[in-house]
């Protein structure tokens, strides 16, 4: 009898690979690279090919459409993915060239060393050891520090190319305004540029209006930017819990999330083997990884918040920084005086990190050690270029609690902490709510810009109603689209399992696609240059009944094709000038095309063709007796 291989054994075997679904190219898409000023700046994009259009005047070529690509090497057919070896260190040479870091002889965290020396963990450990780096004594290695010194790093050039999405090629190739025409947007005072330059990237980072999460110990990450004046980004949360999931599950969730468009991934693991899980994820992730270090610190004291200490938390920060975590959520704004403000709430403190620190504050009747040791935290962050994501530990967990005293008291504190972080040249973004009805969302954005000095805003939704468990990806996407339009730089996705359970791969995909819609809708509303090109291309394909192009240009080609084929599965149906909604005789687009073709044949305008058709129908009505209702 064959003994089934356990998930752990399967994951750590020599031929371990990500699941094949995550590395398949999307239909009619190919990975391309745009080279920068040096050979090792190769910016990945996804190019979607289109078929030709047959017109009465002949063949019209439709240009390929380039879109932002977060999938890393996983979608490159020329790359052999082996998760036991991780990804290639893309940024390693750039980091070495700056000559401001040093390779450590060993790990600095006592907990990391303890895990390394435990033989029981050998089977699950990521065994390819990467050298650990730290800033040389007295050096600051943050992208903000370089930016403020006037230095344009390779990361900044990479980002500028990436943000422009090669749209100049569409502008050059398009023979009309059909693809490049765009509605003017309302940006609410943002400084959105027609073209992103490396200098603009540098300036935005220097001013604190954007961050480049890029730990020097995560050289595998492809540079990206989070800021109000750039494309709206989305984050995907993954992570195990005490009730389930494995290392393999979480690595697969990560690769699945980035396939569908996750710009960053947060590992929120609270179950077993958090350290090992995170190592596997980081070594195989081409996108920035964020964490909430207090979660792991709590595990180290067996879940007893009152037993947490600064020393335990400090060691956890160093442990994770040396693994390569790119940004830390730190709930330093949860202060002792704010905790009583939550007593009037319907749902109290719903943030895990916020509740941990509130309990600690009450148990010791002291200010949080995250607040009192904030400058010490800054010293650690700038030695590895870990960005702050200042946590909203007092965010509202219900519509009832939206925009209350506790929430905005914390927001003001986060603004004060931002200035301290900037004094150390540490990149910083601010986390936001939460549960907020639509008419109160704008106030959140306005106050964040005011109190936090235009540091990037990173929000969870917000959810706009509390009545739809199982559909909170939708309730939150409504709020996410709105706050993204108002100026939020990154949206944290919500899956259908929110408030109900641990999301699986399908939930991750649903959350990603839903939030890609919200982010793109926000880009359109802001008038982000080039945001409408993909919409225009898909609309043109739809009008011309180029079904496969319509599927391929969509955010989820698989689902679009599946829905079409449920009623019209034949291959010939993908050439038909109708769908199953209206059928062949009532398709509005088909009727419009017939009018255009008739006008072209008769050498008259479309309006003249419509008037001529109306006159013929009027004559036909009179000829048949002029009766409104005729007997059949």
Swiss-Prot record:
EC class of this enzyme? lyase
List ligand-binding residues for substrate: 237, 266, 295, 331, 351-353, 392-395, 431, 458
One Gene Ontology molecular-function label: carbon-carbon lyase activity
Cite the binding residues for Zn(2+): 435, 499
Q: Which UniProt keywords apply?
A: 4Fe-4S, Iron, Iron-sulfur, Lyase, Metal-binding, S-adenosyl-L-methionine, Thiamine biosynthesis, Zinc
Which BP terms does GO give this entry?
Answer: thiamine biosynthetic process; thiamine diphosphate biosynthetic process
Q: Which coenzyme or cofactor does it need?
A: [4Fe-4S] cluster
Q: Which GO terms describe its cellular component?
A: cytosol
Instruction: Quote the record's binding site residues for [4Fe-4S] cluster.
Output: 579, 582, 587
Q: In which pathway does it act?
A: Cofactor biosynthesis; thiamine diphosphate biosynthesis
Subunit structure comment from the entry: Homodimer.
Similarity section: Belongs to the ThiC family.
Protein's recorded name = Phosphomethylpyrimidine synthase
Native source organism of the sequence: Nitrosomonas eutropha (strain DSM 101675 / C91 / Nm57)
Gene name per UniProt: thiC
């Amino acid at each position: 009898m064959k003994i089934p291989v356990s998930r752990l054994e399967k994951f750590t075997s020599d031929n371990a690979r990500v699941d094949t679904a995550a590395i398949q190219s999307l239909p009619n898409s190919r990975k391309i690279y745009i080279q920068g000023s040096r050979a090792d700046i190769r910016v990945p994009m996804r190019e979607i090919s289109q078929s030709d259009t047959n017109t009465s005047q002949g063949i019209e070529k439709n240009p390929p459409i380039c879109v932002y690509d977060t999938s890393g090497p996983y979608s490159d057919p020329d790359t052999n993915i082996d998760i036991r070896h991780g990804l290639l260190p893309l940024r390693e040479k750039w980091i070495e060239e700056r000559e401001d870091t040093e390779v450590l002889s060993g790990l600095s965290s006592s907990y990391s060393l303890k895990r390394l020396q435990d033989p029981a963990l050998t089977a699950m450990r990521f065994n390819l050891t990467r050298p650990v780096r730290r800033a040389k004594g007295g050096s600051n290695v943050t992208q903000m520090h370089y930016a403020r010194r006037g230095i344009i790093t390779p990361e900044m050039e990479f980002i500028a190319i990436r943000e422009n999405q090669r749209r100049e090629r569409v502008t050059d190739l398009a023979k009309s305004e059909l693809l490049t025409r765009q509605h003017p947007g309302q940006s609410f005072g943002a400084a959105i540029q027609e073209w992103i330059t490396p200098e603009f990237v540098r300036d935005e980072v220097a001013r604190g209006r954007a961050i480049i999460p890029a730990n020097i110990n995560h050289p595998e990450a492809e540079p990206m930017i989070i800021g109000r004046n750039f494309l709206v980004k989305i984050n995907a949360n993954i992570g195990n819990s005490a009730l389930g999931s494995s290392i393999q599950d979480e690595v697969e969730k990560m690769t699945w999330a980035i396939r569908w468009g996750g710009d960053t991934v947060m590992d929120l693991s609270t179950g077993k083997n958090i350290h090992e899980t995170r190592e596997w994820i980081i070594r195989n992730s081409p996108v920035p990884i964020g964490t909430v270090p207090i979660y792991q610190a709590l595990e180290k004291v067996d879940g007893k918040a009152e037993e947490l200490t600064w020393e335990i938390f400090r060691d956890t920060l160093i442990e994770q920084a040396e693994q390569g975590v790119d940004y830390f959520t730190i709930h330093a704004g949860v202060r002792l005086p704010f905790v009583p403000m939550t007593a009037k709430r319907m749902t109290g403190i719903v943030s895990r990190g916020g509740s941990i620190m509130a309990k600690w504050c009450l148990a010791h009747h002291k200010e949080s050690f995250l607040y009192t040791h904030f400058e010490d935290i800054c010293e650690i962050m700038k030695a590895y270029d870990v960005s702050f994501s200042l946590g909203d530990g007092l965010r509202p967990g219900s519509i009832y609690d939206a925009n209350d005293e506790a929430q905005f008291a914390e927001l003001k504190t986060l603004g004060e902490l931002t200035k301290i972080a900037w004094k150390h040249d540490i990149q910083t973004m601010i986390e936001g709510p939460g549960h907020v009805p639509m008419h109160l969302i704008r106030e959140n954005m306005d106050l964040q810009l005011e109190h936090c000095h235009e540091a990037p805003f990173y929000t969870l939704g917000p959810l706009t109603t509390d009545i739809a468990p199982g559909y909170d990806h939708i309730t939150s996407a409504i709020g996410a689209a709105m706050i993204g339009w108002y100026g939020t730089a990154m949206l944290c996705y919500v899956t259908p399992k929110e408030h109900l359970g641990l999301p699986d791969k399908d939930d991750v995909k649903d959350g990603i696609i839903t939030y890609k819609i919200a982010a793109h809708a926000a880009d359109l509303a802001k008038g982000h240059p080039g945001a409408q090109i993909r919409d225009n291309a898909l609309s043109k394909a739809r009008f011309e009944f180029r079904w496969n192009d319509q599927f391929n240009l969509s955010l989820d080609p698989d689902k679009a094709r599946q829905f079409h084929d449920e009623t019209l599965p034949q291959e010939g149906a993908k050439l038909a000038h109708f769908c199953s909604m209206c059928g062949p005789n009532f398709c509005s687009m088909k009727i419009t095309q017939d009018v255009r073709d008739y006008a072209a044949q008769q050498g008259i305008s479309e309006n003249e063709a419509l008037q001529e058709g109306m006159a013929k129908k009027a004559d036909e009505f009179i000829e048949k007796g002029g009766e409104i209702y005729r007997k059949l």
